[in-house]
Amino acid sequence: WLENVYTTFHGRDIFAPSGAYLAAGVKLEDMGTIITDPVRLPLPKALKTETGYQANIMLIDVFGNCSTTLRVSQVPDLAKATLKIAGQSIEGIVPSYGHRQIGDLVAVTDSEGFVEIAVVNGSAARAYGINLDDPVEVIFHD
């Protein structure tokens, strides 16, 4: 283990060495004390409305992709959803960035199953001034 573990670099100081030990064949139970009472942080949730959901931006990654608090599993028909953010409307949630043109504002599923707002080959956050906690209105159409 590393001699100094800093509270802000767990990826470097804890997770990377742990992965290396596991890859080298060290058993998980030999790597340290079992934590029986982990602190679990609640994820923010989208609020149900008469026409869909009121969501918020909960994460903006280094590429400017903006994950919302709405899970894709909450959307009854991906093609019939309209998302409104930063004065823009996005029609439908598509399977991948490749379903739209370069520069288009798009809604896709992020790696955690949440609706993500992105710009194909660009930064939605930068292009539209999107910030954490910005509101996202999601409307379902029949």
Identify the residue ranges that each predicted region occupies.
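Anionic-ligand-binding alpha/beta catalytic cores of soluble enzymes and soluble regulatory domains
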Residues: 1-69, 74-77
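Flexible, D/E/H-enriched segments
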Residues: 29-30, 35, 110-115, 137
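A residue-level signal for beta-strand positions that form part of recognition/binding surfaces
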Residues: 52-54, 105, 135
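A conserved acidic, glycine/proline-rich C-terminal tail/linker
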Residues: 67-129
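Surface-exposed interaction regions enriched in Ser/Thr/Asp/Glu
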Residues: 134-140
